[in-house]
Amino acid sequence: MITHFCELAAHRNYVLALYRHSLRNVSRINSGFVKHKMKKVITNEARKHKNDKSSWSIYRRLKELKLLSDKLEDDQVNDAYNLLDSFMKSVKKPKNELKGHLMKIRTEIETNKNIQDKTRLTRLNLLHRYIAKKQQNQLLTKHIPDEYKEKLLLPLALHEKGILRLAAIRNQFKKGGYHAKLSFTMAGKTRIWFIRSMLNKRKKQSLRLRNLITSEKRRYLEVCKIVESLNENANWALHEAIWERYLDDGYLHATSSKGYLKMVEIEDNSVKLQNQNDSKVVKCQRLQQWLSPIQSSILSLENYLNQRQMKYAKLKTKILEPKGVYDYYQKKSKRVFQNHMKTYKRMVKNELPFVNPFIERLSIGSILKRNGINVKY
């Protein structure tokens, strides 16, 4: 009797592999809403047709799932999202104009057609997480009309986010004022010193400093390439010297290159070429003749790295001088902290008592933005 396809191990392995591969591709999507929607649809359809005995139906489902997975793998999120309609048995159409508008915004952002609506998508993702959390705690019903989501729950979600932002600001003020600190980054073994403060962090960092750090790291990479080349040349030079010594007097050094020459390496900010204390090697003019140019190059590299290190050591001393760069940023940071503290106290006294999440100009987000506080929604 012919075995049904659902009992074949090859079929089960293929379906399971395709299912897992599709979920991995879904995880690459940036939008939280689209990612959740696709995972939900794929999982529900897989469970629904788990016991389906119709070969034609299963073939059609697997073919559609394979196409959906290929679209996601090629970063064609918009096409993959449109395939969900054909993948589902029953397509739920937008109940009103509002839902259709929200879906249009999400699709445009996924295809990079309208980047200005990124804030809108951020709010929708925030609303989605808010509703999911409340439903998990059984504080909201499973089915909520779209009008309630937009007009009632979205302001509450933004209000909750604003409260968390206020708490973070309050905790920051409790820790004390802003402080400048001396920091460094490594370019090999060289420390590049600079000042960190809230005045020059992230995008406010000096373009000159960024270029300086980048150029120093590139220089160090060039030194590493030169050292690698010297290491290779030293190995060849040693073998050439041994061969010429053999041609001169018939004496053959019965050793490998590592016996006479350690690898060229960067250690404690210095490049070293060390010969083994072997009298036969030291007295051999051929070896000295071949290895001396390499040793000269290594000494030049060592001097170069020492000069870079001394340069930034002097820079550190200059930064820490009285009335120098460090003192300037320290005073500036204290002044900015005092101004922020005054603004915060004025905001708490005059504006926060009248917060209303359902009125845009009285919401916490609007109040924070009016007072110059960054809000990412």
From Swiss-Prot:
Keywords: Mitochondrion
Keyword Mitochondrion applies: yes
GO cellular component: matrix side of mitochondrial inner membrane
UniProt entry tagged with the keyword Mitochondrion: yes
Compartments (UniProt record): Mitochondrion
One of the protein's GO biological processes: mitochondrial tRNA 5'-end processing
Role, per record: Essential for respiratory growth and required for mitochondrial protein synthesis. Required for vacuolar acidification.
Family, as annotated: Belongs to the RRG1 family.
Name assigned to this protein: Required for respiratory growth protein 1, mitochondrial
